[in-house]
Amino acid sequence: MRVGTWICLPGRPGRCRKQHDLGNCPEVPGIFKTLALSPGAPDMMQQPRVETDTIGAGEGPQQAVPWSAWVTRHGWVRWWVSHMPPSWIQWWSTSNWRQPLQRLLWGLEGILYLLLALMLCHALFTTGSHLLSSLWPVVAAVWRHLLPALLLLVLSALPALLFTASFLLLFSTLLSLVGLLTSMTHPGDTQDLDQ
């Protein structure tokens, strides 16, 4: 097992820009190899560690974390917050910008609804005009052929309708006369019915 000290200088998340292996330096004797420090490095970076592979054989540094894992674990949020100016963070934490933004979004929503209504009206008008233009020959044919046929049918059925109306009128008159004669021949029944 190889024991070495790796010092990583800051770079993009998941990767080290430069590494220093102090484990094999002849100037660092014995067990102090694991505690060797690079001159000028910050205290937080002067931490010795042991690099081994998956089976523990000590085959060098571990593989760097890919960008996809950095994005999926939301490391970019922390990176953005650490690099964002404090004035931006203060502006974001306040609610003064939310009301104008909400009004702007409401205005955009109203404009979109108005455009949608205009598009629907245009579609209905266009479809209706196309339907009327396509149905106009049918309406003209009905006006020329079917309407005269209907008028002729009504005129031909008019005598039959008059005869039926006169027959119903005569039948109702006969029923009235029968009722009148019955009341005159049996006046007692009429009085009983009135009581």
UniProtKB/Swiss-Prot annotation:
Instruction: List, alphabetically, the InterPro entries matched.
Output: TMEM239 (IPR031694)
Originating organism: Homo sapiens
Which residues span the membrane?
A: 105-125, 145-171
Q: What is this protein called?
A: Transmembrane protein 239
Provide the coiled-coil residue spans: none
- The main location class comes to membrane
What is an example of a Pfam family matching this protein?
TMEM239
Keyword Disulfide bond found: no
